[in-house]
Each structure stands twice: as C-alpha cells, then as structure tokens.
Amino acid sequence: MIRRLSIAAALGAALFAGACQPQADSEGGEAATGDAGVVNLYTARHYASDERIYEAFTEATGIRVRKIELPADQLIERLRAEGEGSPADVVVIQDAGGMGRAAEAGLIVPFEDAVIDERVPEHLRDPQGRWFAIARRARVVAYDTARVRPEEVDTYEELASPRFRGRLCVRSSDNSYNLSLLSALIERWGEERALEWARGIVANMARPPQGGDIEQIRAVGAGQCEVAITNHYYFLRLAESEDAADRDLTSRVALSFPSIGGQGAHFNLSGAGLAANAPNRENAIRFLEFLTGPEAQSTFANETNEFPTVEGADLPADVSRYAGQAADPLPLPAYAARQAQAQRIFEQAGWR
C-alpha cells in the first residue's frame, strides 16, 4: 500500500529541511517530498560514475533523481531524525552492514517485486525482503610477487601467522570494509577464534594503520610490506591509472582471493531498499528495478570495477578475469548482526 504523508508530517519535513544545511544532489538542491516526476535518493555511495546511472534512469523514464549523499552513519541518523516526515524514497548504502542496520532500525521496509526477485539471486536478497545487493566487492590480499608465493595467502588465517610478522599493511578498524570482514569471520569461526586472528593481524602490522585501500597496495609495491588487505577494485583502478608509476607497481603486485573455510572469499555488498515513508513509492520501485537492469549493472562493472549481482552484465576484461572467484555464501543478516562483536574484538586486539 502506498503511504501518503499527512499534512502535519509534510510540514514537519519542511521545517526539518529548512533547519538543515542543503546537501548536494543531482538537481542542485535538496531532496523534496512527494512529486510525481521525482525519486528522492539517499545514498552513501560516493562514486561519480553513479551519476551516469541516474541520468540513464531519467532518460528512460522521465523521472528525475534528487540525491542526498552522506556517509552511511550520517545517512542513517538523518533518516532517524526525519522520521515519518522523511522525503527519502530509496536508500542505498555501499556496505551490507550499513544496509542491515538501516533495516533493523525500520528505516527501510519489505516490498515485493517480481522483476527484482527474478534478476537478483536469492542469497543476495534480504530474507525479509527489505533490501537487496546491487554490486559486490571482494576483500582480498594484495601481495608482493617477488617475496610471497600464492599458496601463502590463499586463506585469511595465514595473514595472522608468524610468517608475516611486521610485513602486513592494513587500514584502520573503523573502516566499514574491515568491520564487515571481521563480522564474517565471527560468523564462520566464532568470537574466540576471530579475536585470536585480529591479534595476529595487529602483531603482523608493518606500520600503524593509515590511508585507504589504494595506499595499502602502493605500500606493497614500494616494498614497505609484503601483503595488504584491500578491496579488489582498487588494484584494478591502479592498473588502469593514467599515472605510469601506479601502472608499473601493479606488475609487481598480484591479488589473492582468500578462502574462509574452503567456501570462498569474503564479498561485501552495496545494497538498496525502499525507504519506510517513501512519498514516491511507485517511482522508487521503478528506480530499484533499474538498478538491477543491464545498463546499471554494466556501469558498476565498467566504471567502478565492482562485480555485478545480476547475470548477463557487460564486463570489462579486468573484471571478467576475476568474476569466477568463489564467494563465501554469508547470510545477509550476519553482516549487521555481528558488527557490535567485531567492534569489541577490534578494541580488545588493539587494532586502531
């Protein structure tokens, strides 16, 4: 059933919007409330190439995309604060744990759609129908091919072994990608073993955590460490860089997709869902369907080097090279359910 804002709720939304600093959007203003020609997108994805998807959607449907872009935690807090008066129609977060938290807070709601169900595999859809994956990224190991053999980094466990004492680079524990990885390890191994692993990682750090994933790969290429934890697509971006030095270092670095218990590598997910009080529900559903279509899925693969969630998307050669890697079939609810435990383990292990 389409929910409609009451006059009081609409007034509340207007007052809230007036009290807030405007956020950048694809139309140059704030997201608005109900409008038959608009879909209001709240997104934590920060990729400029996503704008091409919004433009393609508008061209195909005539519906404009009004966007508010914020980091996931701020986006969730804004939705909480806006409550029933929120103008949000669609919520997109680049991390499965963030989507899970939004779902548990009631900020996105279950909906049924045959198109999405047919396109997106069941294991990439929330069991309660609240959200689904739109793109996937693997948490992999970048390693120095001159000093590390592939079989030495074919599991996550090996990264915590004495073999790599003082030879590992990794970013800080407050990064959502590391949080989701540790959440997956807790789900698969249990808390005690995951804590032991995190302590091993801290003992193996070549330097205090610093920089983003690209900086970890560059550190491997520069000989500052032998192995690093990163998302797969950052390596592909360096390989395609206009900077010759970046392209050159990728000839000395390779990727391993480590396995968890023989089931496959950890993949994190960008997800999308229907906002709880969407004033433009019909437009929202059309936009959500569009995200699973061939044009959007091919854009994720070709522009951000992510793995699509739908079969048949056009893949560039570098993404296609890794597309067959096995993925740990982690249940979607586990990403969010284990995050509090993961944060506690990071603190206990001294992973800053």
Predicted features along the sequence, with ranges:
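A structural signal for short loop-to-beta-strand junctions that line the ligand-binding cleft
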Residues: S86-V91, V109-V141, E157, R167-V170
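C-terminal motif of bacterial Sec signal peptides marking the signal peptidase cleavage site
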Residues: F16-A19
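An extracytoplasmic/periplasmic, membrane-proximal ligand-sensing/linker region
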Residues: A194, N305-R352
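Periplasmic-binding protein-like
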Residues: G166-D174, F290-D314
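Early extracytoplasmic/lumenal segment of secretory-pathway proteins
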Residues: Q21-G100, R352
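A bilobed periplasmic-binding-protein/Venus flytrap-type ligand-binding module shared by bacterial periplasmic
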Residues: V140-R147, F267-N280, T299-N302
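Ligand-binding pocket segment of bilobal, Venus flytrap-like solute-binding proteins
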Residues: S173, Y177, A184-P258
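Short beta-strand->loop
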Residues: Y42-R45, P127-Q128, Y143-T145, E151, ...
